[in-house]
Amino acid sequence: MSITSLPRAAGLRSDDDNPPPIHNTDDLRIKEIKELLPPGHVIREFPATEKAATTVFTARNAIHRILHGGDDRLLVVVGPCSIHDPAAAREYAGRLALAKREFESELVIVMRVYFEKPRTTVGWKGLINDPRLDGSFRINEGLRTARALLLDIAMLGLPTATEFLDMITPQYIADLISWGAIGARTTESQVHRELASGLSCPVGFKNGTDGNVRIAIDAIKAAASPHHFLSVTKAGHSAIVSTNGNEDCHIILRGGKTTNYDAASVDAAAREVAAAGLAARLMIDCSHANSRKRHENQIEVASDVAAQLARGEQRVIGLMIESHLNAGRQDLVPGVPLEHGVSITDACIGWSETTEVLQTLSRAVQRRRVAVADALG
């Protein structure tokens, strides 16, 4: 067919020229579409208080200074693998808020509050997606529950961290988040890099599931640049978002085919980051591949990193730990009551082990200060 004989675009035809198509080609695999509450509606229900905003502002500034060499404390993102029970999360937050104050001279403690879970295949996708854990997928309820929980935790003076998985959810909760993560499965995703470029909080990018650090380096460079992408406004309208870029992004070493928390791995990663023209500021994920998927190994990882810090290692700026009220994990089985304070996703260390790890890290920071001072003469 020649160019001149191509049919006119549908939008240029008259109604007489454009009868309804015989074949339906739209939404063929869509079962149902429900209205989503606008972000502004949920925010008005649970508005940020002055104390909550101060908690977030103070923590973001502290993390910014850590990332740029202005604060020698250690960032510790610690908490449950995922939130499935808001009551247990509030209990955990109450304990962690006390620990935050106890160790605040050495540690910037941020509670891990993950509402969305990326799945390798299928499974429970988190509190926002299915807040009742029963397959009812009451997402509007999940968004309300998530924001209410974040607000309560911020009111304790405890900052929070979460993983961002889509372009819409941040409009509901991001003002209450002090630090964000982009996971190993999504670090290479263009839309997640674009999202990170516009987030108001510092963001950590995990290395790839195979241990590849390069994709996280590329992600940091991309997120530092301005972007234009599609999302929604606070009123819930489709929108084009233009960003300034995020200078507060860094790498999280989470392991891959092997672990990468030891001194040699840290040095190799730091050199690769520096060779790319970026500041060598690394966070260590004590769980996932670094723990070889055994929650108790997180203690070993944290101890190894603490020893590196005590020897004067300054390129490690933070750790991530999966911790809950009680150790281990449990399966989500319909009709079977859940044990209080036990994860239903990845296994976690318990609270007593958590306090021991925090004490170890606090002492390590103190020793690092001495080592750095001695090195300076």
Can you annotate each of these PLM segments?
Residues 2, 7-34:
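Polybasic, low-complexity association/targeting segments
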Residues 5, 20-27, 93, 106-261, ...:
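Active-site-facing alpha/beta catalytic cores
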Residues 27-68:
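N- or domain-start disorder-to-order transition segments that initiate the globular core
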Residues 38-47, 243-255, 338:
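Gly-rich Lys/Arg/Thr-decorated short loops/hinges at beta-loop-alpha junctions or inter-strand turns
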Residues 75-88, 346:
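Conserved phosphate/anionic-ligand binding catalytic regions in large, soluble enzymes, centered on
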Residues 79, 284, 350:
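Conserved, mostly hydrophobic/aromatic
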Residues 324-369:
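Internal helix-turn-beta structural module
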